Amino acid sequence: MDWHILVILVVSGIIVGIVNTLAGGGSIVTVTMFTALGLPITVANGTNRIAVFLQNLTSTITFIRKGMFNLRHGFLLSIPVIIGNIAGSLVATTIDEKVFKICFGVILVIILLYLIFDNRIKIKEGHNIEIRPWHYLWFLLIGFYGGYIYVGIGYLILAITLWSMKMDIVTANAIKGFVIFIATPFSLAVFMINGQIDYLFGIPHGIGNIIGSLFASHYAVHWGKGFIKAFTLIIVLICFADLIGLVSLHDIFYSMMTVCL
């Protein structure tokens, strides 16, 4: 592997680690980069799980040390996600691209509405969050989705934790990272068994994710909810613009890769 490709993998990993820890959608960058570098989409999707696992492991350790969420709640919500994750990974069919775009667009709109009108929503500060039975069903479906697509799962979790469970955005991000960390090894194992992991790409990119996640999770408390809200809003708007065709993240990133290489 050429040194400049290695640098690109690590640096992009740092950026993705920061984006995913504070908001979500970083996997769009990762998968786009991997395919631009020549990996088949299925291998790119599988290889992405290495970075996802390492990044969420790192952020989870930091969030636990800082006491930013209730660990019991995290484990309870992880159980249906794990079950759904295994089922989703074993499903042979893939979701129709048009259906995916519609669903992803709805999730982005929900997040946008929350970020704009959150002052009118009664937020439950702290860790005394009440988990309702239907929340487990939602997390089961989220786990299924994450098992075979993954891209955008962070926004699905944020949509439920912010809008329905009424968590503050810092706690919601901590729960999001923990749940994804617990569930990812199950889908990662499926991709490993099927030989759809490129370790030469995945490990350097994963190391970058660790660095970015350490940075973001460490300073999340100091930056405060206002900064995280603004950061999330910017990322969501970029993803939404890409989704409706105002910009093309794939074309932009591919052009950058062409210049660098």
List the predicted regions and their residue ranges.
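Transmembrane helix-loop junction
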Residues: 36-37, 43, 89, 93, ...
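Hydrophobic alpha-helical transmembrane segments in multi-pass integral membrane proteins
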Residues: 141-151, 187-195, 202, 240-254
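Residues within membrane-spanning alpha-helices of integral membrane proteins
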Residues: 6, 49, 104-108, 112, ...
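Residue-level signature of transmembrane alpha-helical entry/exit and packing/kink sites
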Residues: 5-9, 73, 77, 101-104, ...
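Selected transmembrane alpha-helices and immediately adjacent juxtamembrane segments
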Residues: 1-40, 125-173, 180, 258-261
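Transmembrane helix exit motif
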Residues: 58-66, 105-129, 240-255
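Selective hydrophobic functional segments
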Residues: 46-99, 184-235
